[in-house]
Amino acid sequence: MSPKYRRVLLKLSGEALMGNLNYGIDPKVVQSFASEIAQVVQAGVQTAIVVGGGNIFRGMKGAAAGMDRATADYIGMIATVMNAMTLQDALEQMNVPTRVQTAIAMQEVAEPYIRRRAIRHLEKGRVVIFGAGSGNPFFTTDTTAALRAAEIDAEVIFKATKVDGVYDADPHTHPNARRYRSLTYTHALTHNLAVMDSTAIALCKDNDIPIIVFSLETAGNIYRALTGEPIGTMVGGSCEIS
């Protein structure tokens, strides 16, 4: 099947990069993700990525342990750059041209985030990985994904996680939890569903950017989502709740 979208933003959780490890980065998992992303690029789809840092450091946990919240968030932003560089290396080993742009200047290892330059890279067929979050504390990488998607005019956000969609309750603690096939932004917000944080969902709603939540643990899911195959959960303004 041919791709349904021309330009996409993929949100990868940091935890997904751990694989079965308790901490850090599993190189085999990164290589697997890179292979799937390469397939998307080879299909001619312009691909941007926002990666989290929770496999290395999570600002909220640091703050809960007594750290200054802003300081903890900045450390978390640096963790996302480590993940971005790791993914860049894996992609370039597969001959996929990739650029890392960071919201905090790190000129020795990455370009600064410049919207027009990012779009130009995408138009030239390069993958762009956005690191360091939005550059501001108190904002999640989910919100960064929504922000960058709006800025680069992405048609959809793919949120690839360890869960196969959005449920009406935590499936780990509620065996009878029901997975949604589709739902609206408003329903996700009013019922506090675990799609993204509320700021990110509101930003997607305001800019009419659909979100597809699916599991990365099934090989080929990124491409399936790209072709419009019904996997995971679709969140959008005109979606039926089902």
Curated annotation (Swiss-Prot):
Species, as recorded: Thermosynechococcus vestitus (strain NIES-2133 / IAM M-273 / BP-1)
Binding site for ATP: K11, L12, S13, G14, G54, R58, T161, Y167, D170
InterPro entries tied to this protein: AceGlu_kinase-like_sf (IPR036393), Asp/Glu/Uridylate_kinase (IPR001048), Uridylate_kinase (IPR011817), Uridylate_kinase_bac (IPR015963)
Keywords: ATP-binding, Cytoplasm, Kinase, Nucleotide-binding, Pyrimidine biosynthesis, Transferase
Tagged with keyword Nucleotide-binding: yes
Entry GO MF terms: ATP binding; UMP kinase activity
Principal location: cytoplasm
Pathway note: Pyrimidine metabolism; CTP biosynthesis via de novo pathway; UDP from UMP (UMPK route): step 1/1
Catalysis performed (reactions): UMP + ATP = UDP + ADP
Subcellular location as annotated: Cytoplasm
Enzyme class: transferase
Keyword set includes Transmembrane: no
Activity regulation statement: Inhibited by UTP.
Taxonomy, superkingdom: Bacteria
EC identifiers of the protein: 2.7.4.22
Protein name according to UniProt: Uridylate kinase
GO BP annotation list: 'de novo' CTP biosynthetic process; UDP biosynthetic process
A GO cellular-component term linked to this record: cytoplasm
Oligomer and partners: Homohexamer.
Gene3D superfamilies: Acetylglutamate kinase-like
Similarity annotation: Belongs to the UMP kinase family.
Record-listed UMP binding positions: G53, D73, S134, G135, N136, P137, F138, F139, T140, T141
Disulfides per UniProt: none
UniProt-listed Pfam families: AA_kinase (PF00696)
Role this protein plays: Catalyzes the reversible phosphorylation of UMP to UDP.
Coiled-coil intervals: none
